[in-house]
Every structure is written in structure tokens, then in C-alpha cells.
């Protein structure tokens, strides 16, 4: 418990620089950064509870960070009142059965390809899951609820391609799914199937009309606007 306060030196409760470790059942409290993995592959990160320092949201550190770290399993962790869980330049990681509450981004992927996000519960965060400059990835069987406020969004895409979004519950969010210039790569798609969008301000918002978004067997109920294309709404 209790890390330093410097963002310049990435002060954290646990700093990992190695492969094939098991990090489990740690309670990291009052940390600027919680668990920080850099260039660390094939680790099991399980059953940890992470809380940030009592700071304003924007100046907290990240609860869990994977930086240039691949093929890790992140499961059954609780990340509460942190800033973000991030995977930057981090590929083929699995995030499973985690709980994220009252943070900014539950998971923020950037330049991170082919990650899997399944059976997580994300409540009361500004954004549930965000894909930025990514290729591939699967998001399935998650519950994302109450991502509200000016930027409230369940799942977001920015110049992302090749993702599969299936069998998720996205409810009570400002925007269920928000997509900007996605899919980005030529001839790529984003597949959305079997999801439930309920009681959101907007079910799905497309900020650009690139095409390549395939939607099959999704349920829309009780959203103020079901789907908006470039500012044009469709409630049918």
C-alpha cells in the first residue's frame, strides 16, 4: 500500500519487468500506478484488488498497465477508483472475469492487436472499452453499464479494424458503441453480433461512413436513439 506520487517516474505499488510470473491475490491500495508491466510476457495476473490514490480522476495513475507486453492473462481482478487499465503496444493478451468500477477507461487499447476481452463487468466508468489504432480483437460476454457523462461510452473505436463484438450487454450508457473512422484498414470489417443495447442515449454512433460494419442479431431496446450515422438518427 502507498506508492510515490510522481508520474514522471511512474511510481507504482508493483513494477514488473520479466516473463512467466504469477502475480495474484495482491491488494494494492493508495497507489499512483497499481500494477505496472513493461516488456513483460506470458504472465498470469489474477485475483488482485487495485485502488488508486484519492486524487481527481485525470491525475490518478493507471490501475493496471501493460506496455509492450504480450500473451498475458489478466483475470478475476478488481480495479476500482483508478484511472485506466491500459494495454499499449501489447498484443494477444486476455482480459477475463475482471471488475472495473468508477474509473475512466475500464480498458484502453492503443496500437494493441488481437486482444481478447471476455466475461468482464464494467460499471460507472467514463468509457468501458476503447480501441485506438488497433487490429483484431474480440469482445464477448461482457456487461458494460452506466458509462455516462459528456464522454460516456460503452465501447469505442478510433481508426480500429478487424474487431469482433459479440454477446455483450451494453446498458445505461451515454453511447453504447461509438465508432470513428473504423474499420480503418482497407477491406477490413468490424463485426457486431448478438449484443443487447438497452436504455442508452444512443445505441450506436458512427462518426464516419467508411462502411465495413456488419451488424447481425443485435437487440435494441429503450435507447433514446437506436443508431446514428454521421448525425442522422434512426429509431426504427
Give the predicted meaning of each segment.
Residues 5-15, 30-33, 57-68, 80-84, ...:
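Extracellular beta-strand/beta-solenoid scaffold signature
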Residues 11-24, 41-46, 64-73, 91-94, ...:
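Surface-exposed loop/turn motifs in large extracellular/passenger domains
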Residues 112-208:
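Eukaryotic tandem repeat interaction scaffolds
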Residues 150, 154, 180, 222-236:
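Functionally critical loop-and-helix segments that line ligand-binding/catalytic clefts
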Residues 199-233:
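Repeat-solenoid scaffold signature
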Amino acid at each position: 500500500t502507498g506508492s510515490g506520487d510522481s508520474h514522471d517516474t511512474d511510481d507504482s505499488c508493483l513494477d514488473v519487468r520479466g516473463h512467466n510470473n504469477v502475480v495474484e491475490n495482491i491488494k494494492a491500495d493508495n497507489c499512483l500506478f497499481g500494477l505496472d508491466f513493461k516488456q513483460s510476457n506470458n504472465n498470469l495476473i489474477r485475483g488482485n484488488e487495485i485502488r488508486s490514490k484519492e486524487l481527481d480522476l485525470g491525475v490518478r495513475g493507471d490501475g493496471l498497465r501493460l506496455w509492450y507486453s504480450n500473451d498475458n492473462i489478466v483475470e478475476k481482478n478488481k480495479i476500482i477508483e483508478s484511472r485506466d487499465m491500459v494495454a499499449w503496444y501489447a498484443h494477444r493478451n486476455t482480459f477475463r472475469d475482471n471488475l472495473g468500477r468508477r474509473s475512466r477507461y475500464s480498458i484502453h487499447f492503443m496500437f494493441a492487436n488481437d486482444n481478447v476481452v471476455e466475461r468482464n463487468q464494467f460499471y460507472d466508468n467514463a468509457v468501458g472499452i476503447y480501441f485506438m489504432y488497433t487490429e483484431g480483437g474480440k469482445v464477448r460476454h461482457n456487461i458494460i453499464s452506466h458509462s455516462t457523462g459528456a464522454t460516456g461510452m460503452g465501447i469505442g473505436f478510433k481508426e480500429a479494424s478487424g474487431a469482433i463484438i459479440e454477446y455483450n450487454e451494453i446498458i445505461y450508457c451515454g453511447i453504447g458503441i461509438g465508432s470513428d473512422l473504423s474499420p480503418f484498414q482497407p477491406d477490413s470489417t468490424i463485426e457486431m453480433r448478438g449484443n443487447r443495447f438497452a436504455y442508452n442515449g444512443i445505441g450506436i454512433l458512427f462518426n464516419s461512413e467508411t462502411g465495413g460494419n456488419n451488424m447481425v442479431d443485435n437487440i435494441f431496446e429503450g435507447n433514446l436513439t437506436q443508431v446514428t450515422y454521421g448525425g442522422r438518427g434512426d429509431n426504427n
